[in-house]
Curated annotation (Swiss-Prot):
Catalyses which reaction(s): AMP + diphosphate = 5-phospho-alpha-D-ribose 1-diphosphate + adenine
Family, per entry: Belongs to the purine/pyrimidine phosphoribosyltransferase family.
Record PANTHER family: ADENINE PHOSPHORIBOSYLTRANSFERASE (PTHR32315:SF3)
Keywords: Cytoplasm, Glycosyltransferase, Purine salvage, Transferase
GO-annotated cellular components: cytoplasm
Protein EC: 2.4.2.7
GO molecular function, a single term: adenine binding
Protein name per the record: Adenine phosphoribosyltransferase
Superkingdom of the source species: Bacteria
Organism encoding this protein: Acholeplasma laidlawii (strain PG-8A)
Quaternary structure note: Homodimer.
Localization of this protein: Cytoplasm
């Protein structure tokens, strides 16, 4: 299936000079959404994943169906202050400033095989921070999966030690 046909290009969003890749049309098309979910599921199954992790918010959209399909848990990675129990937090640099992500301390058990799923691989900063959270808790990151990869931003280089799967490249 040509998943690119289900991605809308929106010029000058969220600011002038940006070409935003809108995944909403894919999510609205049941067959395309199922196809993407099935591709992620097969990747996670091939990695023998015990747990799926997804950064907020769109990592939830693609990660949860995979966890359900495999009968494994899903652990959400959130912005600080959004998780109600004890959590670990990692800060990372952005082009202009920094950001932080958190994960419940009991979300990942030592030795668990984890696949992390998100919608977009751009610079790789969010995914690198998510990997760091999982590994801090003793998880083994066996794969990273993305709906879209923006090749020019070279985020894959930051993640070179991991098996990366993308469904759409721009």
């Amino acid at each position: 299936m040509d998943l690119k046909a289900h991605i809308a290009a929106v010029k000058d969003f969220p600011k002038e000079g940006i070409l935003f890749r809108d995944i909403t049309p894919l999510m609205l098309d049941g067959k395309a959404f199922k196809y993407a979910s099935d591709q992620f599921t097969e990747f996670a199954r091939s990695k023998k994943a015990d747990l799926i992790v997804g950064p907020e918010a769109r990592g939830f959209i693609f990660g949860c169906p995979v966890a359900v399909n495999l009968g494994v848990g899903f652990a959400p990675v959130r912005k600080p202050g959004k998780l109600p129990r004890a959590s670990v937090t990692v800060s990372y640099d952005l082009e202009y400033g920094s950001n932080s992500l958190s994960l419940h301390e009991d979300a990942v058990k030592p030795g668990q095989r984890v696949v992390i799923i998100d919608d977009l691989l751009a610079t790789g900063g969010t995914m690198q921070a998510t990997v760091e959270l999982v590994e801090k808790l003793g998880g083994i990151v066996v794969g990273l999966a993305f709906l879209i990869e923006l090749d020019d931003l070279e985020g894959r280089k930051l993640l070179k030690n991991y098996d990366v799967k993308t469904l759409i490249n721009y």
